[in-house]
Amino acid sequence: MLKTISPLISPTLLKVLAEMGHGDEIIFSDAHFPAQSLGPQVIRADGLSVSDLLRAIIPLFELDNYAPPLVMMAAVEGDTLDPAVEARYRDALSLEAPCPDIVRIDRYAFYERAQKAFAIVITGECAKYGNILLKKGVTP
């Protein structure tokens, strides 16, 4: 056990967060995301919500200052977003510093970013459009 590391962060996730360099991206996905078929390393975090994991990792993770560090999937035409999902994520990400803007991109553009991500963390999140991409920055 390590002191001050949340027990929600598995050893595998902790290793991945440490191995990521600035500019690398990680996705925290909902339970329905097609992570296995997209290619990068997949980490299971079944039973945990995305917001709980964000709250756990943000004290350890510097967000990028040079490019938009937060990306979520936009709703497909004719569908709607639940604003409470983004609000929960913003709340979790605001623990260390003000939360940067979240950029929304279409579903297929998000999948393309996911293919290039350092890792995808599949959670137990059931919220529709509950996926978020974080771009790692340089530690001060």
UniProtKB/Swiss-Prot annotation:
Binding site for substrate: D30, R107, Y129, G130, N131
Active-site residues, record numbering mapped to chain: H22 (proton donor)
Pfam families per record: RbsD_FucU (PF05025)
Biological process (GO), any one: L-fucose metabolic process
Catalytic activity as recorded in UniProt: alpha-L-fucose = beta-L-fucose
Listed pathway(s): Carbohydrate metabolism; L-fucose metabolism
Recorded GO CC terms: cytoplasm
SUPFAM superfamilies: RbsD-like
Subcellular location(s) per record: Cytoplasm
The enzyme's E.C. designation: 5.1.3.29
Enzyme class: isomerase
Family matches, as HAMAP family: L_fucose_rotase
Chain's role: Involved in the anomeric conversion of L-fucose.
Subunit organization: Homodecamer.
The protein, known as: L-fucose mutarotase
Protein species of origin: Salmonella arizonae (strain ATCC BAA-731 / CDC346-86 / RSK2980)
